[in-house]
């Protein structure tokens, strides 16, 4: 059983950073528990089917888990947004953003001085999906 506290509005960002999204278990920990598991036990097959279809509840730790949920809720509170998404790496975050914005037939203009792995992603991978890329100098406005 977890207990989530309701915090007063207009808290200082420092307070939000350490207090938002803490759900204490029956053990009363003072910070998030880290869930070091790959999967979560389901009460029955019907519940399991619903969770796998809807994404509500926890099924497999790589798709979502209480530790990541707490991070996402805290980040959203700090940024003043309704939601946030956590990624396992910077490239994971970059790929998620790009895949959410681009589609086949789009053309992207990028600086040659971007992060190397991002350059590689556009130079070698996105063409396979019909996304064209032009690389330009960041300092030469006539290019």
Which residues does each PLM region occupy?
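Conserved PLP-anchoring active-site segment centered on the Schiff-base-forming lysine
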Residues: 100-118, 136-137
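N-terminal glycine-rich, Lys/His-bearing helix-loop that initiates the first secondary-structure elements
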Residues: 1-55
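PLP-dependent aminotransferase-class I/II
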Residues: 120-143
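Conserved N-terminal alpha-helix of the aminotransferase class I/II PLP-enzyme fold
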Residues: 39, 44-92, 117-124
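Well-ordered alpha/beta subsegment
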Residues: 80-81, 107, 143
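Glycine- and other small-residue-rich loops at beta-strand/loop junctions that grip anionic moieties
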Residues: 60, 86-87, 111-112, 133-136
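Alpha-helix C-terminal capping segments
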Residues: 77-78, 96-104
């Amino acid at each position: 059983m977890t207990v989530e506290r309701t915090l007063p509005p207009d808290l200082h960002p420092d307070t939000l950073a350490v207090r938002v999204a803490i759900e204490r278990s029956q053990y009363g920990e003072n910070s998030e528990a880290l869930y070091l598991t790959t999967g979560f036990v389901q009460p029955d097959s019907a519940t399991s089917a619903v969770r796998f279809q809807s994404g509500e509840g926890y099924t497999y730790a790589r798709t979502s888990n209480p530790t990541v949920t707490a991070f996402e809720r805290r980040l959203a509170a700090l940024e003043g947004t309704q939601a946030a998404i956590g990624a396992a790496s910077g490239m994971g975050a970059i790929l998620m953003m790009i895949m959410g914005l681009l589609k086949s037939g789009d053309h992207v203009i990028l600086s040659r001085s971007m992060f190397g792995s991002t350059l590689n992603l556009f130079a070698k991978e996105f063409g396979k999906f019909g996304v064209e890329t032009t690389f330009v100098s960041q300092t030469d406005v006539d290019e």
